[in-house]
Structure formats: structure tokens, C-alpha cells
Amino acid sequence: MSGPNPNKEPVELNRTSLFWGLLLIFVLAVLFSSYFFN
């Protein structure tokens, strides 16, 4: 699963995964709220 750039810092990878995790949680929260309040 290592990209073409193995010298990439793990901090950037952690920030990217954290950003995608928060985005996924936000989208799920919006979907669930619209489903429950409808």
C-alpha cells in the first residue's frame, strides 16, 4: 500500500486519513439527520 514516494512523511498521511475520516463522519451525520428528521 506504499505509494510511489516511500520517503513521504507519515505526518502528512495521518493528516490526510484524519481529514477523510472527519469528512466521512460529517457526511454520515448529515445523511442520518436528514433521514431521522424527515
Swiss-Prot record:
Keywords associated with the record: Chloroplast, Membrane, Photosynthesis, Photosystem II, Plastid, Reaction center, Thylakoid, Transmembrane, Transmembrane helix
Q: Which Pfam families match?
A: PsbL
Q: How does it sit in the membrane?
A: Single-pass membrane protein
**GO CC terms:** chloroplast thylakoid membrane; photosystem II reaction center
- Role, per record: One of the components of the core complex of photosystem II (PSII). PSII is a light-driven water:plastoquinone oxidoreductase that uses light energy to abstract electrons from H(2)O, generating O(2) and a proton gradient subsequently used for ATP formation. It consists of a core antenna complex that captures photons, and an electron transfer chain that converts photonic excitation into a charge separation. This subunit is found at the monomer-monomer interface and is required for correct PSII assembly and/or dimerization.
> Quaternary structure?
PSII is composed of 1 copy each of membrane proteins PsbA, PsbB, PsbC, PsbD, PsbE, PsbF, PsbH, PsbI, PsbJ, PsbK, PsbL, PsbM, PsbT, PsbX, PsbY, PsbZ, Psb30/Ycf12, at least 3 peripheral proteins of the oxygen-evolving complex and a large number of cofactors. It forms dimeric complexes.
Which protein are we looking at? Photosystem II reaction center protein L
